[in-house]
Amino acid sequence: MDYYELLGVSRTASADEIKSAYRKLALKLHPDRNKEEGAAEKFAQVSEAYSVLSDTEKRAHYDRFGSAPGAGMPGGDXFGGMGGMGGVGFDPMDIFEQLFGGAAGMGGRGRRGPARGDDLETEVRITLEQARAGEEVEVTVDRLTECEHCHGTRTEPGGKPPVTCSTCNGSGAVRGQARTIFGVVETQQVCPTCKGDGKMVVDPCTVCHGRGRTLKSEPVKVKLPKGIDEGYRIRVAGQGNEGPGGNGDLYVHIEMEPHPELHRQDENLIFPARIGFATAALGGRIQVPTLDGPQEVEVKPGTQHGELHRLRGQGMPRLQGAGTGDLIVDYEIVVPKHLNAEAKDALQAYARAVGDEVPEEHEGLFGKIGKLFGRD
């Protein structure tokens, strides 16, 4: 079994690439979401692959010897744990919760008492129109929520209640001693048996496997502040993972959908307006797209290339401060590459009228070659 092949990454993949690959596969194969035959075993396999490849020392050992450290060692169960995976006491759910958060993962280890659920992060792409109006958008979030079967008790309904952990006597922590330069000091660590809970489940819930929570995809409403821009993030309180000590928060990262015609520059919007030479010289009217719809704008006679015209109050609301930005029309004078005979005559007449030098008719390549050799 090739760990790199399991995760679908190359042997030179970075830590971020390995993490991203595992994240996608774990969400797809998680037992709470995928009931297909073999999904649980595949979930365990990709979890073990990630547990090895995400650890620098374990990955180096695997790259050198083709196996994880300790695999197949005497006294070890080469096929122990969930899904027939190697490693003594290996639990793929622990690997999952360390990445996605959970009381048995990042949120609970090292804490005493009820643990708060972990914070979650996601992203949403919005339009300029949505950012300007401060609309409410919806995102779908994968959250750990209370198991509906056991209601978070972790015990199968009707089963035997949890018992006090014999290792820590229900305290959730174990004491020890450590030798330091200041002498021997007393230490306290999370109980390795009950993982800080103080109790051991006797009859685990058949749905959540004794964890008290299951993974669910849920819609979350997010109110956009007016004028929000790319790179900002919004905190939605209580929409992270659920935990016995309260819910974590959800952080939504903002990405902007490119507008087909307008460019944003802080609170201002820029419209590159391409106009012809005649319109620039004589003036005229053009249609300018705004977030409220097309607006007719007058082009003054003698408009120069790069000249700016400001439509006040037609930009974005200032995110921090009062007022609204402007929509700036940036004129770009387009010089035609090809002219018909009538247009050429008109421009030559104009040039003579204003005293501009009129260039001679452009000769083709064969005409120049003919002159070079004395041909008419």
From Swiss-Prot:
Needed cofactors: Zn(2+)
Main location: cytoplasm
Keyword Oxidoreductase: no
Keywords annotated in UniProt: Chaperone, Cytoplasm, DNA replication, Metal-binding, Repeat, Stress response, Zinc, Zinc-finger
Superkingdom per UniProt: Bacteria
Pfam family, one: DnaJ_C
Source organism phylogeny: Bacteria, Thermotogati, Deinococcota, Deinococci, Deinococcales
Identification of the protein by name: Chaperone protein DnaJ
Family: Belongs to the DnaJ family.
Biological process, per Gene Ontology: chaperone cofactor-dependent protein refolding; DNA replication; protein refolding; response to heat
